[in-house]
Amino acid sequence: MFRASKALGQRFASTNVPVKTARPFRNFLWKLGAATTVFYVGGVALSTYNYQFAELFTDNVPLAEELVQLVESYNDGTLNAPQLSLDEIRKKFGSITRKVQSVPHLGSTSSTVTESQSIASGSGSTAAAATTGTDSNSVVLSSVPPVGSVLLRLPHLKLDDDSNSFNNKSFVESFNKQVDSLNEKEFILPENAVESFLESYHGLSSQLNELNRDLADQLNSQLGQLSAELKQSVESDKVKEIESNKLQLMQQFEKDLSNLKVEFEQKFDSQLQSSLKANEQAMLAKHKNELAMLSIKQVQEFNKIISNKIENERNGRLKNLDELNGSVKTVSDSLAALEETLLRSECVNQLTNLVSSIKFKLNLDNTPSLDISKDLQKLTTLVNILPGKPNKCDAKEPQLIDVVVNELNSLTSAKENKQILSNEQLLNRWGLLQDKIREASLLPPNAGFLGHVSAKFFSLFLFNKSGISNENDIDSVISRVTENIKLNRLDKAVEDVVQLQGWSRLEADDWLQAARSKLELETLVDVVDHEIKTL
């Protein structure tokens, strides 16, 4: 049919001047189809040899799985296409050929070739007509169609919904494109030829639908048979696999059971041995405990007998032993009280003598610097051993004598206070400071070099005073401090020096610290003396 259509199209086209037109869209479709075909053919071919590529190809490419299964079934010989005999093919397509051959030829007016000859000759007559038209260039189309002729319009080929698969769709689309190309050429044929051609065309559509249905039925029957055979083979394989697994499981179960039995026997034997050993140790320990309790009871009975013997002897020959013990305790308490009284009296006497000695040393005038560290150590020892004081751990507040002794030790512990100045030394140092104090009293505030020179010069004209004066000028203060030191009234002297201001106070600062140290020491010694007198 396609050959006849092609020959007929060439006959009709021989009357026209051939014009080559570019069809980029059609070329693109052909290239796309060729590339797609090569891609699918290469993918299917490689999938038959590489299992990993087959999984990747069938999972990501549409229709790849169906094509791979089709090729595998073809290689295995399980695909059986419907076998049609030559008579059946002639019976289905012979009528179409006869109807196409009966179509008359409507070409140029100069052509003398008959319709039957052109169809029978095929491509040869078409080539001759094309050559004639090309060489002579005198072919002229008939401007007026003959009477009884109609325009050839072929409808699109349509298949049933049951036969509408992907391959059939591609074939139908390609065929319909050819039909559209024929319709675009607008062939004019006799009415009876058009009717016979359309009848053959519709017969072709029905024959294709019938062929697709037969092919689908045969494929379904073969698929059902193959699925049944596959199911039967799978079931037989499963039965064999189940039997083998059952046998393996039974063997494994028997093996595990025997191992478990041996393990339980070993565990039971070990537990039995451990329990027997524990019971043996418990029995031995119980036996030892009973022996120990028996020996303890025997010792208790023996002690009881001894205590009874002693009580009997005490009530007999040692009857007055308790009275003697009470008398001895009374005598010992009296002796302890007497010893405490004597010790307290001795400590008080020693403390009194020691304090008197310290006072005597402090009041001496013609002695060098005083060192009373040894006297203070002895004083601390006597205070610590003095009886009658409460215990330091039980007392809530410390005793006054303890606090005073600690202050004395801290006062003399500093390096500069280990040597205490006597009254004679304080008087001599004060005499050396008198000229500096007078000179400093004449200095103006913020005095410079000229101020110091002027103060030095004018201090030569000052008169020295003596005795005790109640005035507050610098000469009266100096004479009053001197007299207080001579009369052993150090507290009054310190009070007058403290009231000095400016450079005079700064010049007398060292002397004031030494005097204060001695004054504090005398005050603490007086407190210790008064505290001793209260004991």
From Swiss-Prot:
Major subcellular site: mitochondrion
Mitochondrial matrix face residues: 13-26
Region of interest (Disordered), residue spans: 106-136
Domain of life the protein comes from: Eukaryota
Homology family: Belongs to the MICOS complex subunit Mic60 family.
Source taxonomy: Eukaryota, Fungi, Dikarya, Ascomycota, Saccharomycotina
Protein topology in the membrane: Single-pass membrane protein
Keywords (A to Z) from UniProt: Coiled coil, Membrane, Mitochondrion, Mitochondrion inner membrane, Transit peptide, Transmembrane, Transmembrane helix
The protein's name in its UniProt record: MICOS complex subunit MIC60
Record-linked Pfam families: Mitofilin (PF09731)
Any single biological process term in GO: cristae formation
Extent of Low complexity compositional bias: 120-136
Mitochondrial intermembrane side of membrane: 50-535
Coiled-coil segments on the chain, per record: 191-342
Polar residues compositional bias, start-end: 107-119
